């Protein structure tokens, strides 16, 4: 296939044992579904992020999907827009490849039955017609935010790499922080994992890992354009009740 079409990407759509998923990667599949869909806590995301960025990166290329045609994750079934936004931030900034199943941007969340992960009126069994234009006019869509995330990814080489992921300590389990650097492009990400309440914490940046000398450093928030001065122990507060962009900071460090 690659002799005629080298741009083709083979995706292993397999949620199975880690050994089998890794074997598919070694056999030639360029990308794979991952367990990100079920990693929700700070500890789970940190451990899994380290695994795919360092532990298995020589042969396993993860694709972080926020949902799939088969999986309507429990954490999305409340329909809270902030949860959809924060999961999109995580998926789009932790790894170079991410994906979603149509309807995510419209906050589709109804489950077929309580305790299950199957979508109500699943598109696997019927043709679905979605009113994207109408949702856009009513402001009931995450599409502009998703487009913004993809524009940020396109503009920043650091977010197009897998192995440069570094996590940083925070004083709260409700907020996760990590960084990615490629040359002079240094991006820091702070995400509120609580979609319902404002959370604040101190982020303890590993300055050596960031490659920054000195104390204070200037950053620009790529989501809202705000300029801020941060330091090795930065207090941040993120309120999901504000526009969806404020579930997170995605900042570029001015080097």
Where are each of the predicted segments found?
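Active-site neighborhood of glycoside hydrolase catalytic domains
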Residues: 1-21
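Carbohydrate-interacting/catalytic domains
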Residues: 3-5, 22-30, 43-58, 100, ...
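Structural preference for beta-strand elements that scaffold enzyme active sites
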Residues: 7-11, 30-32, 61-64, 98-99
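Substrate-binding/catalytic cleft of secreted carbohydrate-active enzymes
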Residues: 12, 33-50, 75
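Active-site beta-loop-alpha junctions enriched in small/polar residues
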Residues: 13-17, 66-68, 105
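Active-site clefts of carbohydrate-active enzymes
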Residues: 57-81
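Short, glycine/acidic-rich beta->alpha junctions
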Residues: 80-84, 170
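Hydrophobic targeting/anchoring helices
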Residues: 85-101, 110-113
């Amino acid at each position: 296939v690659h002799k005629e079409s080298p741009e083709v990407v083979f995706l292993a759509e397999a949620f199975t044992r880690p050994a089998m998923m890794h074997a598919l990667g070694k056999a030639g599949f360029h990308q794979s579904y991952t367990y990100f869909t079920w990693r929700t806590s700070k500890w789970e995301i940190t451990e899994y992020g380290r695994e795919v960025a360092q532990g298995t990166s020589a042969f396993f290329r993860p694709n972080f999907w926020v949902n799939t045609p088969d999986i309507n994750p429990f954490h999305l079934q409340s329909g809270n827009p902030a949860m959809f936004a924060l999961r999109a931030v995580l998926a789009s900034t932790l790894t170079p490849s991410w994906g979603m199943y149509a309807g995510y941007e419209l906050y589709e969340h109804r489950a077929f039955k309580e305790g299950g992960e199957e979508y109500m009126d699943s598109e696997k069994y019927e043709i679905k017609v979605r009113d994207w234009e109408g949702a856009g006019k009513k402001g009931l869509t995450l599409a502009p935010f998703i487009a913004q995330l993809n524009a940020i990814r396109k503009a920043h080489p650091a977010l197009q790499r897998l192995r440069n992921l570094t996590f940083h300590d925070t004083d709260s389990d409700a907020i996760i922080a990590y960084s990615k650097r490629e040359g002079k492009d240094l991006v820091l990400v702070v995400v509120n994992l609580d979609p319902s309440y404002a959370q604040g914490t101190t982020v303890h940046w590993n300055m050596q890992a960031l490659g920054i000398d000195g104390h204070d450093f200037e950053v620009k928030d790529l989501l809202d354009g705000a300029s801020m001065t941060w330091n090795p122990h930065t207090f941040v507060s993120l309120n999901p009740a504000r526009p969806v962009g404020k579930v997170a900071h995605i900042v570029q460090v001015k080097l």
